[in-house]
């Protein structure tokens, strides 16, 4: 049975130091080779924390493969808005604003990892994360936008986004 090591690394900037080195050193793998593979696989997520699985397929032959997960929703929102972090007072001092198009873009990236059955439901999850980060949506309180989604205000936008797939 293959051994699996799960770590959270900065996209494109994994290094042999902690948390990676100590986790994979005991497995007998070439740490530099693993780090290089991870950096190659995560370079598109530069500046974001990315979940990575290192699967040791054959410890004797030292063969492994890398599986890159999708960064947390909060990381995708920060990257989309170009902000360093969420608000320390989410209700009183918003740090950015997402458009519905941006919400749908993030929801499409994350939908396979969410429990949401539809793009609409996944978008509402993204909006919930935006709320906790102090990010408005369409210039409004995210809860208001979630109600508008329930009322069908953005149905045309969702239909267009689902056709594009």
Curated annotation (Swiss-Prot):
Q: Which Gene3D superfamilies match?
A: Ribosomal protein L11, C-terminal domain, Ribosomal protein L11/L12, N-terminal domain
The record's PROSITE patterns line, in alphabetical order, gives: RIBOSOMAL_L11
Per the UniProt entry, the disulfide pairs are none
Query: Which InterPro entries would you find in this protein's record?
Result: Ribosomal_uL11 (IPR000911), Ribosomal_uL11_C (IPR020783), Ribosomal_uL11_C_sf (IPR036769), Ribosomal_uL11_CS (IPR020785), Ribosomal_uL11_N (IPR020784), Ribosomal_uL11_N_sf (IPR036796)
**Molecular function per GO:** large ribosomal subunit rRNA binding; structural constituent of ribosome
Listed A to Z, the keywords are: Ribonucleoprotein, Ribosomal protein, RNA-binding, rRNA-binding
Keyword Ribosomal protein in record: yes
Protein name (Swiss-Prot/TrEMBL): Large ribosomal subunit protein uL11
Entry-linked HAMAP family: Ribosomal_uL11
A Pfam family the protein falls into: Ribosomal_L11_N
The biological processes this protein is annotated with in GO are:
translation
Q: Which family does it belong to?
A: Belongs to the universal ribosomal protein uL11 family.
Coiled-coil annotated spans:
none
A GO cellular component annotation here is:
large ribosomal subunit
Q: What does this protein do?
A: Forms part of the ribosomal stalk which helps the ribosome interact with GTP-bound translation factors.
Quote the SMART domains the UniProt record gives: RL11
Q: Which organism is it from?
A: Thermococcus gammatolerans (strain DSM 15229 / JCM 11827 / EJ3)
According to the lineage, what is the superkingdom?
Archaea
Gene encoding this chain?
rpl11
Subunit-structure text: Part of the ribosomal stalk of the 50S ribosomal subunit. Interacts with L10 and the large rRNA to form the base of the stalk. L10 forms an elongated spine to which L12 dimers bind in a sequential fashion forming a multimeric L10(L12)X complex.
């Amino acid at each position: 049975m293959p051994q699996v090591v799960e770590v959270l690394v900065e996209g494109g900037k994994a290094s042999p130091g902690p948390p990676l080195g100590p986790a994979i050193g005991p497995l007998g793998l070439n740490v530099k080779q693993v780090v290089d593979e991870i950096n190659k696989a995560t370079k598109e997520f530069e500046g974001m924390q990315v979940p990575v699985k290192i699967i040791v397929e054959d410890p004797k032959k030292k063969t492994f493969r890398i599986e890159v997960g999708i960064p947390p929703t909060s990381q995708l929102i920060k990257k989309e808005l170009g902000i360093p972090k969420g608000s320390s007072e989410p209700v009183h001092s918003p740090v950015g604003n997402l458009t519905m198009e941006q919400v749908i873009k993030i929801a499409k990236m994350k939908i396979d990892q969410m429990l949401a059955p539809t793009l609409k439901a996944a978008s509402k999850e993204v909006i919930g994360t935006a709320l906790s980060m102090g990010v408005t949506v369409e210039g409004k309180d995210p809860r208001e936008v979630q109600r508008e989604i329930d009322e069908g205000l953005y149905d045309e936008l969702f239909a267009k986004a689902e056709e594009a797939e």
